[in-house]
């Protein structure tokens, strides 16, 4: 084990020298850890020693598929710092006897260090299989081995514990294969806004819910904490999720309940334990029921933490804290419910800065996977600014652009209080000089509150890596409506935010193909679904809700091929693209996973999608149920993906067999010709 630790130690400094700025230290905690069964995956990690200060500490958790593939279920994964309390405990176990005359029962003591868990962050795995029920009804396929998604957590307040040698635990609460975990920490040197002088756990786990009295007494009882000397402020962090599904209450996974944070016996803070944006998470589409709203979590996303300022209640030498959940009743015999809870309290010393504004992150342009909904970008710039100090932040100039290129300056005004943030949408940058591949984008704050500068200039600037949106050659839009067309709308906006093309008056089960001609520039295409369930979802197919299936959307290159394909997209499908001769590559052409025939049932026109196999020509046969050939089409090229439209309005209303053949491949599907539309 000593050799492993030395290797990790050396890896840290190589990364720092070659990849990151001089004031940033990278430490790898887990590398390709295979989470394949319900257990704790521990790794001893060497962090910086005492004496260093860090203004920001981030933890990056990269989730991927295990070597055997991704699991098909939504499991929670906790990242915990296992703090050695200095105490020692032991267990007593009976050993098998080796003496029968007389009988001797021996015992053994297992001595171990007492470790206290501090939860740094939590995520819920996506449904990694069952990705295409039309093609794989038994869920035999999932994300491929290259799939990864990175989650970022701000763990700055855990600085006193991220010292010397510490065990970092990836706690996988799954019961099947599996996911991989890569965890790294990023330490950015400097003074934090307020130094942490003590960290105390309020709750470290949840439990089953039988009734309100049982849960509050056994799982989340009120606790009294002593306030450390020299404390000037304090804050509580809460992570809470609901699980299980009682048939009477739908709790805890599918019921929206409030939870209350009490201070000294009085409710002071309230939050709704509910996520309604699961149809917009960055990891989609998924198998499973990923679109449903849930109790403060979504499959394929990190669990959002809640923070509450306790400073106004720091009177005396102790404080009583308590968490309560809105009461509900479970039906007897209807299944169990539970809530996973962790809560930590941070006690701080005096502030280091009286006035400190920061750029917290750049959402667009960026290659960071949490912002994939807005990237790759060529349009408006999206940044997040934060006020770290108690003095209100009311204005600032923002300078931004391609690093090394022409910069643009805009003015932000608002009124941000202590630790409040604002997402700022800015006009497009000057993209002159952008190149193919990865570029760097810079944004910085100037003259916040009309001052020359704030007291902490180290966080006034943020740099992101990005790739400019791809170029589209002349294209056409293909939209096949499902049975709920009133839920959908299509818009294309230019870089000024002006709508230059739109369509929303769709008819049910009708396919639209329209050429789109635009002047040179940057554009955003947005397809929305008011019910946040896309155009086609396997759940509706299995439950017989066919009016919400069989929709499809494609961006087709007029010369052949497909730029974009989607049908299961939840709330929206958003993409940026460039028209013209900017120095960016053309968008890669995609291929469908298989042949597709739609709409089905058909009322007169049948569209047949043939993937690009580049194997000569394809042929299509339409036969009746007795095998009699009704129609045939030959010599369909397969160098690129093609959609072939067939008029079947002259056929009688009946069931037909459509067979598509390409070389040694063939695809057969039943199609219903119907006269009812």
Regions found by a protein language model. Give the residues of each.
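Terminal connector regions
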Residues: 431-468
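Bacterial Sec-dependent N-terminal signal peptides
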Residues: 1-24, 584, 600, 646, ...
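Loop and turn regions of beta-sandwich accessory domains that flank beta-strands and are enriched
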Residues: 116, 125-131, 141, 280-285, ...
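Residue-level detector of functionally pivotal "anchor" positions at catalytic/ligand-binding pockets or at interdomain
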Residues: 351-374, 463, 469-475, 575-598, ...
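Extracellular/secretory-pathway and virion-surface proteins
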Residues: 20-367, 372-377, 388-391, 456-458, ...
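C-terminal outer-membrane/trafficking sorting elements
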Residues: 492-494, 589-598, 602-677
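Short glycine/proline/serine/threonine-rich loop/turn segments at secondary-structure transition edges
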Residues: 157-164, 314, 431-440, 532-539, ...
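Intrinsically disordered, low-complexity Pro/Gly/Ser/Thr-rich segments with frequent PxxP/GP/PP motifs
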Residues: 405-435
């Amino acid at each position: 084990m000593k050799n492993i630790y030395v290797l990790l130690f050396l890896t840290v400094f190589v990364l720092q020298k070659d990849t990151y700025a001089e004031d940033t230290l990278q430490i790898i905690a887990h590398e390709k850890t295979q989470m394949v069964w319900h257990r704790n995956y521990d790794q001893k990690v060497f962090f910086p020693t005492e004496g260093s200060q860090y203004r920001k500490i981030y933890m990056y958790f990269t989730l991927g598929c295990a070597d055997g593939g991704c699991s098909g279920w939504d499991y929670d994964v906790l990242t915990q710092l296992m703090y050695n309390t200095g105490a020692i405990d032991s267990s007593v176990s009976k050993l098998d006897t080796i003496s029968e005359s007389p009988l001797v029962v021996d015992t053994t003591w297992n001595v171990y260090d007492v470790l206290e868990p501090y939860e740094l962050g939590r995520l819920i795995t996506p449904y990694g299989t069952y990705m295409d029920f039309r093609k794989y009804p038994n869920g035999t396929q999932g994300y491929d081995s290259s799939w990864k998604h990175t989650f970022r957590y701000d763990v700055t307040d855990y600085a006193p514990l991220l010292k010397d040698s510490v065990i970092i635990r990836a706690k996988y609460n799954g019961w099947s294969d599996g996911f991989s975990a890569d965890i790294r920490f990023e330490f950015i040197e400097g003074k934090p806004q307020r130094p942490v002088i003590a960290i105390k756990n309020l709750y470290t786990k949840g439990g089953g819910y039988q009734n309100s009295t049982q849960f509050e007494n056994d799982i989340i009882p009120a606790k009294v904490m002593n306030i450390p000397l020299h404390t000037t402020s304090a804050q509580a962090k809460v992570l809470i999720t609901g699980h299980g599904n009682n048939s009477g209450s739908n709790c805890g996974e599918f019921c929206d309940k409030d939870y209350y944070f009490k201070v000294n016996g009085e409710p002071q803070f309230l939050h709704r334990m509910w996520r309604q944006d699961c149809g917009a998470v960055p990891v989609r589409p998924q198998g499973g029921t990923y679109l449903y709203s849930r109790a403060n979590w979504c499959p394929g996303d990190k669990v959002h933490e809640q923070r509450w300022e306790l400073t106004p209640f720091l009177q005396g030498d102790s404080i009583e804290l308590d968490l309560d959940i809105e009461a509900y009743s479970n039906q007897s015999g209807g299944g169990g419910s539970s809530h996973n809870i962790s809560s930590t309290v941070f006690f701080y010393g005096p502030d280091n800065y009286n006035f400190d504004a920061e750029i917290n992150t750049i959402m667009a342009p960026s290659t960071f996977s949490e912002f994939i909904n807005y990237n790759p970008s060529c349009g408006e710039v999206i940044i997040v600014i934060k006020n770290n100090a108690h003095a209100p932040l009311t204005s600032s100039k923002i300078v931004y652009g391609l690093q090394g290129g022409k910069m643009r300056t805009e003015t932000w005004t608002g009124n941000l209080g202590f630790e409040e943030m604002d997402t700022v949408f800015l006009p497009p940058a000057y993209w002159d000089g952008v190149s193919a591949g990865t570029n760097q984008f810079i944004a910085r704050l100037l003259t916040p509150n009309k001052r020359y500068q704030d007291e902490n200039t180290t966080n006034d600037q943020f740099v992101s890596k990005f790739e400019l949106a791809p170029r589209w050659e002349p294209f056409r839009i293909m939209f096949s409506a499902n049975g709920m067309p009133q839920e959908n709308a299509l818009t294309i906006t230019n870089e000024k935010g002006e709508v230059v093309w739109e369509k929303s008056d769709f008819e049910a089960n009708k396919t639209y193909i329209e050429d789109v001609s635009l002047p040179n520039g940057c554009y955003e295409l947005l397809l929305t679904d008011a019910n946040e369930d896309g155009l086609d979802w396997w759940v509706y197919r299995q439950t017989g809700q066919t009016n919400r299936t069989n929709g499809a959307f494609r961006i087709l290159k007029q010369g052949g091929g497909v730029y974009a394909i989607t049908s299961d997209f939840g709330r929206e499908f958003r993409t940026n693209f460039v028209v013209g001769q900017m120095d960016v590559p053309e968008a890669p052409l995609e291929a469908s996973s298989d042949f597709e025939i739609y709409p089905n049932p058909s009322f007169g026109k049948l569209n047949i999608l043939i993937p690009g196999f580049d194997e000569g020509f394809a042929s299509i046969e339409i036969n009746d149920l007795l095998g009699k050939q009704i129609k045939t089409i030959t010599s369909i090229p397969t160098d690129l993906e093609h959609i072939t439209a067939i008029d079947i309005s002259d056929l009688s209303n009946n069931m037909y067999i459509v067979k598509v053949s390409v070389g040694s491949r063939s695809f057969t599907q039943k199609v219903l010709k119907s006269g009812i539309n």
